[in-house]
Amino acid sequence: MIGWDGAPITLGGRVVLRDIVLRAGAGELVCLCGPNGAGKSTLLRAMAGMLPGSPRQDPRRIAWLPQGARCAWGLTVAEVAALGRIPHGDASAAPVERALVACGLEGLRDARVDRISGGQARRAMLARAFATDPEVFLLDEPTADLDPAAAHAIMALLRATAAAGRCVVVVVHALDLALHHATRLVVLADGRITADAPPAEALAAAAAAFGLPFGCDPTPRLLPPRA
């Protein structure tokens, strides 16, 4: 279980999030959606204990992947994934291998991350989070800059991870991905939660937050049926 208890979140002397009460538990894939500046990343950082005054979190229990996280050039894919074991103080091979397989990188374990595609490098960072073997994943836009097929594959992996008993909270800017994969959709606008419900029930609030025309259907048309 992880969440936020309603305390206002202030940055630079300005309240950017207020009246936020959110709880996410095992088995859930919670997608945070909303327009730019809505406070999605700020809320996730607060939940991860990365903001001044926010409760510190145990890095063995929570895997945090910030927006735009980059691999260290010169490392191999396996070495990047192994960084996820640092909070545990060990270099156990088994969790790293499971992470590589889960992220579809077992064939690239010895490849340098500066010699693979951007999408593969992003998956290497995700493998780092998986190698931590956490109870909770807090991921800020892990599908950014990926092609639709790769983004769908990562979201399907995260949904399966949640179904296996982990808690996954993810910022997703592509509304169609969130509607297709989330078990809960949390919509933020102007620093407040405007909806927190299963995707079908939160659709109207999500469309309003993104400024979509009334009656517009943003549901996915090109993604395969969810397993």
Regions from the language model: what does each represent?
Residues C33-P35:
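The feature captures the beta-strand-to-loop junction immediately N-terminal to the Walker
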Residues A48:
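Helix-to-loop junction immediately C-terminal to a conserved catalytic motif
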Residues A93-L108:
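Conserved ABC ATPase "signature" region
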Residues R112-I116:
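Conserved ABC ATPase signature
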Residues A129-F130:
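ABC ATPase C-loop
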Residues F137-E141:
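Catalytic Walker B motif of ABC-type/P-loop ATPase nucleotide-binding domains
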Residues V172-H173:
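H-loop/switch region of ABC-family ATPase nucleotide-binding domains
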Residues A207-A227:
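ABC ATPase nucleotide-binding domains
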